[in-house]
Amino acid sequence: MVGKLNPTRFIFVTGGVVSSLGKGLAAASIGALLQARGFSVRLRKLDPYLNVDPGTMSPAQHGEVFVTSDGGETDLDLGHYERFTGVMKTRADNVTAGKIYHELIVKERRGDYLGQTVQVIPHVIDLIISCILHNDAGADFVICEIGGTVGDIESQPFLEAIRQVSYRLSKNLTIFVHLTLVPYIGAVGELKTKPTQHSVKELSSLGIQPDIVLYRSRAQLPQYQCAKIANFCNVAEDNIIAALDVSNIYMLPVMYHEHRLDTQILKHFDVDSPEPDLTQWENVLRMSETASDRIVIAIVGKYVTSLDAYTSLEEALRHAGLHSGIRVEIKWVDARLPASEIDLTDADAILIPGGFGDNGIGTKICAIEYARVNNIPMLGICLGMQLAVIEFALNVAGIEDANSTEFKSDCKNPVVCELPGLQVGDEYKMGGSMRLGSYTCNLAPGSRIMSIYDSSTVVERRRHRYGINPEYRDVLSKCGLAFTGAAEDRDLPEVLELPDHPWFIGVQFHPEFQSTPFKSHPLFLSFVTSTLQVKKASSRS
């Protein structure tokens, strides 16, 4: 959408008291509401950690790595941004302190700062500001979420940068939205506003006066407590807005609109607009209430103890359930447990997600064998596809010591191997060295995968260093494993099927990154609907 406003307005979303309050979802909801009023938006995440990107961070600690179309390994909040607004993110939309310092050192070594003493102020701050102001899409609103919590040492350069942006652009082109926690103290049965007051005081000490305070709470505050926050935080009472706990994140845009968040933002900017068209959000909420059938999908992974490790995957299954009228329940199965200790008997389908390393591989392979032998629908994604090949090679094709060189570098039959051409030079580089971003996959005529996509080609996102060894394609095919999708740019099998199985598909790419609540991804939709069909057929037999 072409921008209507000139110049662009900037919205900065900060957080206080504790982390994980939902700043990313608040920013995404603001973007969705402004879109619903006809404006164009661009969302960015500013992360204060010193990693260049989250690509080498453990999902158990940081959550999933969301891969952008241009190959960026980014924070999971960018996934929320894409799903809520439909605006494709790029690697430039995730700015980390590590990325800033890396660029700074490169510039210093190149002589760009010749004669100067390179310091946090102005050099680091100026680089952050240039990332914030970069708006090549000409959006009406740029929404920047600042990671971390106000008071953290590492976030101070980013807070100083947004303070300077507000000073340089003038107040009527910027707005500060601060999300805090209003905890409920069960012993006295009260909601407490003091942490919010202290958080705003901390932010104000850094030169930033919030214009809107969003308070995360289990219940809406009475008027007198909102007035108390307004008085002690120097914020208009109309701008003290509830960010209530919800059972469904897709309720948030409608809830925030009901609480007048978008109205107050536009009032601050003195911008007129029609009321938002929230029809698509209301439709999503309506669909979420109409599910009649139920299925259980077991996700067998090694990061299942972290709620954020498989965010996009969980949302993609939810989208498929919304658009099929099926209630999808996820059973999390810890692959780090021995295979003898996991129970899949109540699972209607099995999903093996992506991952790295050999921890939990044996249990995942046993789960794949269980699905294959018992005609249970199975979807393998990235590593899940590779393990499906290993399982088939060992147990059906009888290939001795079939394995991946990721797990056993000297195996006799490397049916999965490292992709050539990913390493340049003698030094082994872990970060950013994989096959990343969107590539085209050609689908075989007459295959199940082609009928699912209703197309002979598909563009999906990748994040992998290992792939199926094409030298074993023929021998595996002769034993009944059909390779029905191949990379357009290299000799690399990317889709497999078992033709005689009710639904058994492996894909090397990550389809979950392109599913939205408004348009379920066809692969997940087929997986969910076919699972219900198989369940009903087995119950009749």
Curated annotation (Swiss-Prot):
Activity regulation information from UniProt: Allosterically activated by GTP, when glutamine is the substrate; GTP has no effect on the reaction when ammonia is the substrate. The allosteric effector GTP functions by stabilizing the protein conformation that binds the tetrahedral intermediate(s) formed during glutamine hydrolysis. Inhibited by the product CTP, via allosteric rather than competitive inhibition.
Domain of life, per lineage: Bacteria
SUPFAM superfamilies named in the record: Class I glutamine amidotransferase-like, P-loop containing nucleoside triphosphate hydrolases
Enzyme category, top tier: ligase
Catalytic reaction list: UTP + L-glutamine + ATP + H2O = CTP + L-glutamate + ADP + phosphate + 2 H(+); L-glutamine + H2O = L-glutamate + NH4(+); UTP + NH4(+) + ATP = CTP + ADP + phosphate + 2 H(+)
Keywords for this protein: ATP-binding, Glutamine amidotransferase, Ligase, Magnesium, Metal-binding, Nucleotide-binding, Pyrimidine biosynthesis
Active site per the UniProt annotation: C382 (nucleophile), H510, E512
Annotated metabolic or biological route of this protein: Pyrimidine metabolism; CTP biosynthesis via de novo pathway; CTP from UDP: step 2/2
Residues engaged in binding L-glutamine: G355, L383, G384, M385, Q386, E406, R465
Presence of keyword Glycosyltransferase: no
Annotated binding of UTP, by residue: S19, K192, T193, K194, P195, T196, Q197, K228
UniProt xrefs under PROSITE patterns: GATASE_TYPE_1 (PS51273)
E.C. designation(s): 6.3.4.2
Residue sites binding ATP per the record: S20, L21, G22, K23, G24, L25, D77
Glutamine amidotransferase type-1 domain sequence ranges: 296-537
A Pfam family this chain is assigned to: CTP_synth_N
Any one GO CC term of the record: cytosol
Residues the record lists as binding CTP: S19, D152, I153, E154, K192, T193, K194, P195, T196, Q197, K228
Binding site for Mg(2+): D77, E145
GO molecular function: ATP binding; CTP synthase activity; glutaminase activity; identical protein binding; metal ion binding
NCBIfam families: PRK05380.1, PyrG
Function: Catalyzes the ATP-dependent amination of UTP to CTP with either L-glutamine or ammonia as the source of nitrogen. Regulates intracellular CTP levels through interactions with the four ribonucleotide triphosphates.
Note: CTPSs have evolved a hybrid strategy for distinguishing between UTP and CTP. The overlapping regions of the product feedback inhibitory and substrate sites recognize a common feature in both compounds, the triphosphate moiety. To differentiate isosteric substrate and product pyrimidine rings, an additional pocket far from the expected kinase/ligase catalytic site, specifically recognizes the cytosine and ribose portions of the product inhibitor.
Complexes and interactors: Homotetramer.
Full protein name: CTP synthase
Originating organism: Anaplasma phagocytophilum (strain HZ)
